[in-house]
Every structure is written in structure tokens, then in C-alpha cells.
């Protein structure tokens, strides 16, 4: 329903609107996004555990879901993604320090090798 209109146009209809706090009509609900993030995280952890020699899983997706995954990874829920700025074509790494989930690297620019 919000496809093709600007944030300002949405806020004219819904003051204070944010995708993080209000979501989008006819889109996934916040609980649905949270369930999807949890499934992706569980699958990634399962893959890492079963492929110990690899030790990493790469996820490629649109910015909002990657930000939602980061928020969920840290226990902030998908809305915690609002705290993370994410540019196009950047690298982010989620990991652990001991048993605590961490952000190892976020929004790192990829530059070609010299």
C-alpha cells in the first residue's frame, strides 16, 4: 500500500510513521518479521554447527531485513534494526565474544584489491 510514495507522504496520513514502529499495511506484521528473523538465525547457526570447517554463513538481502536480523541477533527484536545505519554494497559481520552475541563489523565498505 505504501509502494511508490515517500516517507513524507505517508507521514502526512500517519503522523510519526516509521517502518520500525508502524509497519506497512498489507505487509508482514512485526511478530511475523520477528519469527522470520528467528528462523533465519536458527538456520544459520545450524549450518555453522554442521559445517564446523566452514564456520560462517553469508546472507544477502535487502537493507531493512538485514537491519532487523542484526536487532534480533542482539536480542533487541527486529525494531532494534532502526539503530543500525546500513549502506548499499557493504559488509556486516555478526558473531560472538565468548557466548555473547556481538556485531563484529558493520556497514564496512568493500574496496577492490590494488
Regions found by a protein language model. Give the residues of each.
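Generic beta-sheet signal
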Residues: 53-64
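Alpha-helix N-cap/helix-start capping motif
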Residues: 38, 63-64, 88
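Generic structural signal for well-ordered alpha-helical scaffold segments
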Residues: 34, 38-49, 70
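Phosphate-handling substructures
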Residues: 1-39, 105
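Conserved short-loop catalytic and cofactor-binding motifs
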Residues: 21, 25, 57, 82
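Acidic, low-complexity terminal tails and accessory targeting/binding regions
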Residues: 1-9, 49-55, 71-114
